[in-house]
Amino acid sequence: MIYSSVILEEILRFANPSETVWVASKSKGNTKELALAFVMTPRFISKTQIINSKNIIDGWSWQDYTLDKLVRIYIICLISELDGADQLNLLFDTAEINEAVALHAALPALKNPTQFLLRATDAVRSNMGSVFESIAFENPYPSLYFSELAWNQMVLKCIFNDKAIHRIYGLENRANQALADTLSDFAHERWAAGRRVPSQVWRLVPKFMNENLQSDIKKLEQSDNPRDILAAQLVIKEIDQPGSTKEQWKELELPEPIYQV
């Protein structure tokens, strides 16, 4: 599917007359001209908040986007539709933080998204939080294209850095035994140090119970923390009634520093 036309419709809902003229003037350029427009976008486009946005790809949310970011994504899509992979790779190589955020956020809408799989997995290793979050959160690209190893690395990085894993699209669908076992090992390390893990991480284990994980859930049941007790109850319920706990896990989708005692 070609997404640029749908994105343009959304842009025109929020752009003022001068911004509309600027976007129209750049839309017919070649890949080099579009790349220049991508870099220049913040000079001509405001940071108007995008609200009540369309859902054109499952899991791809523009909820926190600004207009200049959406215009950049539109331009990226135009370059992709012109088979401008070389130009996009050049933009990746030279991007400052906000440009990199837009590039990674745009990946699900590109003409040949798998061409940029290495770029996406590199973003998981980025030390720039906003770049990491642009691929990890409200972005279906990892769920669609990451290997199990790359997926697990992304989820674990979120957990280790106390980031909100419920913002990862496809979290339950991509759960796997290796990830569940690693979470158990991580919990044992935290507990040995007198620390906790965020209670909602246990949503990833019901399909993969083994002796170690069963022991972990029993430990949660005996916790003094009501969030841990609720997590244990939800794991048990999910085992008995698969798919029944999705809404209830939302009660645990709150900031919960992993280093709290």
Name the predicted role of every residue range.
Residues 1-81, 154-261:
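N-terminal alpha-helical scaffold/docking segments in eukaryotic complex subunits
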Residues 76-190, 206:
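Eukaryote-skewed repeat-based solenoidal scaffolds used as protein-protein interaction platforms
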